[in-house]
């Protein structure tokens, strides 16, 4: 199987997001890379599901709370940007203050 660099990036995001979801389900607080992966995967999934850019940004900002992550992580992530493929093409999705 041959994957483009972009496809490899998405695969890494999804793999780390799956690990993070398992840890979250076990009650383990997420670190910085895990948190970014979960937020990015939520944005990619929303775009793939046919949502608008605005809906994807709004939904991705609600997937994690301060209780889900280690201390200091929300301050380390002022925004998350990911290029997602929507029904009308690729767009850069920016999620501001993704951890409330």
Curated annotation (Swiss-Prot):
The record's Gene Ontology cellular component field reads: cytoplasm
**Top EC class per UniProt?**
hydrolase
Q: Which reaction does it catalyse?
A: urea + 2 H2O + H(+) = hydrogencarbonate + 2 NH4(+)
* UniProt superkingdom: Bacteria
What keywords is this UniProt entry annotated with? Cytoplasm, Hydrolase
Location relative to the cell: Cytoplasm
Q: In which pathway does it act?
A: Nitrogen metabolism; urea degradation; CO(2) and NH(3) from urea (urease route): step 1/1
Q: How does it assemble?
A: Heterotrimer of UreA (gamma), UreB (beta) and UreC (alpha) subunits. Three heterotrimers associate to form the active enzyme.
UniProt record similarity statement? Belongs to the urease gamma subunit family.
- What name appears for this protein in its UniProt entry? Urease subunit gamma
Q: Which organism is it from?
A: Laribacter hongkongensis (strain HLHK9)
Q: What is the lineage of its organism?
A: Bacteria, Pseudomonadati, Pseudomonadota, Betaproteobacteria, Neisseriales
List the gene name: ureA
């Amino acid at each position: 199987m041959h994957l483009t660099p972009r496809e490899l990036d998405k695969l890494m995001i999804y793999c780390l997001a799956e690990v993070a979801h398992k840890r979250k389900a076990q009650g383990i607080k997420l670190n910085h890379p895990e948190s970014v992966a979960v937020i990015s995967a939520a944005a990619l999934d929303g775009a793939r599901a046919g949502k608008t850019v605005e809906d994807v940004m709004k939904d991705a900002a609600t997937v994690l709370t301060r209780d889900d992550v280690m201390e200091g992580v929300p301050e380390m992530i002022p925004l998350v940007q990911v290029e997602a493929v929507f029904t009308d093409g690729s767009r850069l999705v920016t999620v501001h203050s993704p951890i409330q």
